[in-house]
Amino acid sequence: MIKRALISVFNKNGILKLAKFLNEKGVEILSTGGTYKHLKENGIPVIEVSEVTGFDEILDGRVKTLHPKIHGGILAIRDNKEHMDTIKNKGITPIDMVVVNLYPFFDKVKENISFEEKVEFIDIGGPTMIRAAAKNFQDVVVLTDVNDYDDVIDQIEKTGEVAYNTKKRLAGKVFNLMSAYDGAISRFLLEDEYPEYLAVPYKKKMDLRYGENPHQTAAFYEAAFGDGAMKGFEQLNGKELSYNNIKDMDIAWKVVNEFDETVCCALKHNSPCGVAIGENPLDAYKKAFECDDTSIFGGIVALNKVIDKPAAEEMVKIFLEIVIAPDFTADALEVLKSKKNLRVIKANEKPSDNFELAKVDGAMLVQSADNKLTEKMEVVTDKKPTDEEMRDMIFGMKVVKYVKSNAIVVVKNGAAVGIGGGQVNRIWPAKDAMERGKGAAVLASDAFFPFGDIVEEAHKNGIKAIIQPGGSIRDQESIDGCNKYGISMVMTGIRHFKH
């Protein structure tokens, strides 16, 4: 039975309802600082912690509850006679419920405030109390989440107590929260790209219907620390998002944000199937559609500019899963909403990934993000590319780095008219891309050419300019082939494998 509760919260949502309920049930309430004042002002009987400890708050409130009369009351095991005799002899009364939420370090660390101000939002007393309560969960109810208040109220109302399994779950939530909270603080203080222990806090945003396939379970988590495009998006229309939808959105949004020009990316199964620069959103969309008018069906479309009504009217002519853009005009949104299942996503932030994580069985791989396009732009052939070819080379390299390796993209006038990827050798995607992109003049490769066969195929298909990282022991073979056929070639020094 709960006889005494300690309440100390930063987020005061729902706390009056809980405190009033506890008071009506005859529970004595202890509190500190702002929470004490809030409860008092709302007519709820409350005792200040300093009255219990006989010790005033000190050090600008850094020390409030760090006292044996508080922690002894929380940690004493009720079925342990020695524990109970000890606290009785010390004049300590048991505390049966601890209601605490922490200083909002996750939010404050992002604000434009000084380092010292951010440090002040590292909570000490709160974590100490909730860890103590969680350790002694069989005797103490610990609440850290506003969303749990009603469940606890309901259980006490119906049975007079909180069920063991509920107390255990609430205790588990404490350590789950603390691992994220401490992980964020660790990242803030260490500023280490590869710390000894990897603590990257994520908070669940929603459960997903299923994972990559229907028999797999899944959930969507947002980074608790820092920003990110997939963290801050808004869904303006359509069915709930799936696991595959979110993965595809991420890649499509990254592709279009490689460019300053108006660019549209059509994407399917996590790989671009059409990318194009246009004079306006409609023009960019139509050109991306023409890159592969088959694969775009049932895919995702991303634009890096505000989508207007003409573009929206063209998009709704076919079945699309998702349209993602930085914003939509009001009339464009009305058109898109005419397709009730079409997911319309407003992306509020540009991509900001600096690191990538890859789960392997029993371990995690961490690497810096592939954010560097080229090391150099070295023309290695007798023939130099024209300005137009050079623009298409850069365009192609920006696209090919998002295609599964081995990857080849062929480009014509700012459009990826042929995309080949996901093959275990380089000649197959080259043939595939050139077959799809008849008439293309520029070829971009995510990695070096191991043999001269790519150049031979390029010549057969009318390619006039090639961009690739270089670095093969047979680079000269490819250079000689280009010189033989009058093809210009640029080497960048940067490989873009994507597995």
Curated annotation (Swiss-Prot):
Cited Gene3D superfamilies: 3.40.140.20, Methylglyoxal synthase-like domain
EC number: 2.1.2.3, 3.5.4.10
Catalysed reactions listed for this entry: (6R)-10-formyltetrahydrofolate + 5-amino-1-(5-phospho-beta-D-ribosyl)imidazole-4-carboxamide = 5-formamido-1-(5-phospho-D-ribosyl)imidazole-4-carboxamide + (6S)-5,6,7,8-tetrahydrofolate; IMP + H2O = 5-formamido-1-(5-phospho-D-ribosyl)imidazole-4-carboxamide
InterPro entries in alphabetical order: AICAR_Tfase_dup_dom_sf, Cytidine_deaminase-like, MGS-like_dom, MGS-like_dom_sf, PurH-like
Pathway recorded for this protein: Purine metabolism; IMP biosynthesis via de novo pathway; 5-formamido-1-(5-phospho-D-ribosyl)imidazole-4-carboxamide from 5-amino-1-(5-phospho-D-ribosyl)imidazole-4-carboxamide (10-formyl THF route): step 1/1; Purine metabolism; IMP biosynthesis via de novo pathway; IMP from 5-formamido-1-(5-phospho-D-ribosyl)imidazole-4-carboxamide: step 1/1
One example of a Gene Ontology biological process annotation: 'de novo' IMP biosynthetic process
SUPFAM superfamilies: Cytidine deaminase-like (SSF53927), Methylglyoxal synthase-like (SSF52335)
Keywords, sorted A to Z: Hydrolase, Multifunctional enzyme, Purine biosynthesis, Transferase
Top-level taxonomic group: Bacteria
Ranges for domain MGS-like: 1-144
UniProt cross-references to Pfam families, sorted A to Z: AICARFT_IMPCHas, MGS
GO MF, one annotated term: IMP cyclohydrolase activity
GO CC entries: cytosol
Domain-related comment: The IMP cyclohydrolase activity resides in the N-terminal region.
Homology family: Belongs to the PurH family.
PANTHER family: BIFUNCTIONAL PURINE BIOSYNTHESIS PROTEIN ATIC, BIFUNCTIONAL PURINE BIOSYNTHESIS PROTEIN PURH
Descriptive protein name: Bifunctional purine biosynthesis protein PurH
Species per Swiss-Prot/TrEMBL record: Clostridium acetobutylicum (strain ATCC 824 / DSM 792 / JCM 1419 / IAM 19013 / LMG 5710 / NBRC 13948 / NRRL B-527 / VKM B-1787 / 2291 / W)
